[in-house]
Amino acid sequence: MTRQATIDRTTSETSIRLSIDLDGTGQTDIATGIGFLDHMLTALARHALLDLTIRATSDLHIDDHHTTEDVGIVLGQALRQALGDKKGIRRFGHAIVPMDEALAEAAIDLSGRAHVAWSVPFLQSKVGTMDTELFEEFFRAFGGNALMTLHVTLKAGTNTHHVAEACFKAVARALRMAVERDPRVGDAIPSTKGAL
């Protein structure tokens, strides 16, 4: 069974086409129009071992908000679709990842319930040209549309670039663990309810 999905989403603000392969090798082809977001999404895919293609056009003449949030929405929808009924997955994932002085922790439960807890203070309002408040918007959109429980916590860090990158890599490693097939589970759904 292939665990792939392609989502097209067009609104008056953005037009996004995204393809994901959960059993990839971390290959990416990403163009959102926001350089730093592309960099973070590349890191996410590489460390989660997802193949990820994203094409986004949007109202960047206004700001980066709509693009960042909508890419999160579509990525969450694609992840949910690619997972299907979630038979045989590990379901839970966690990681603590350093990036120089920054240390970020992420925990994921592919529970079918949307909850995002974000505890990541930034000392600067921008990294490059991107507003740092948009990282929370991205992960809330991603986690909410994937119907996952996602906790992201900054344990240490002062450099804005390092903090953001540690968060994306921690989520990537946690996601890699959660979507991985568990040979001990077989084709069972990892829930006492029998459904996720």
UniProtKB/Swiss-Prot annotation:
GO CC, alphabetical: cytoplasm
PROSITE patterns given in the database record: IGP_DEHYDRATASE_1 (PS00954), IGP_DEHYDRATASE_2 (PS00955)
Pfam families: IGPD
UniProt pathway: Amino-acid biosynthesis; L-histidine biosynthesis; L-histidine from 5-phospho-alpha-D-ribose 1-diphosphate: step 6/9
EC number of this enzyme: 4.2.1.19
Top enzyme category: lyase
One GO biological process term: L-histidine biosynthetic process
Taxonomy, superkingdom: Bacteria
Subcellular location: Cytoplasm
Catalyzed chemical reaction(s): D-erythro-1-(imidazol-4-yl)glycerol 3-phosphate = 3-(imidazol-4-yl)-2-oxopropyl phosphate + H2O
Record keywords: Amino-acid biosynthesis, Cytoplasm, Histidine biosynthesis, Lyase
GO molecular function, one term: imidazoleglycerol-phosphate dehydratase activity
Cross-referenced PANTHER family: IMIDAZOLEGLYCEROL-PHOSPHATE DEHYDRATASE, IMIDAZOLEGLYCEROL-PHOSPHATE DEHYDRATASE HIS7
NCBIfam families: PRK00951.1-5, PRK00951.2-1, PRK00951.2-4
Record family assignment: Belongs to the imidazoleglycerol-phosphate dehydratase family.
Designated name of the protein: Imidazoleglycerol-phosphate dehydratase
Protein species of origin: Granulibacter bethesdensis (strain ATCC BAA-1260 / CGDNIH1)
Gene (UniProt): hisB
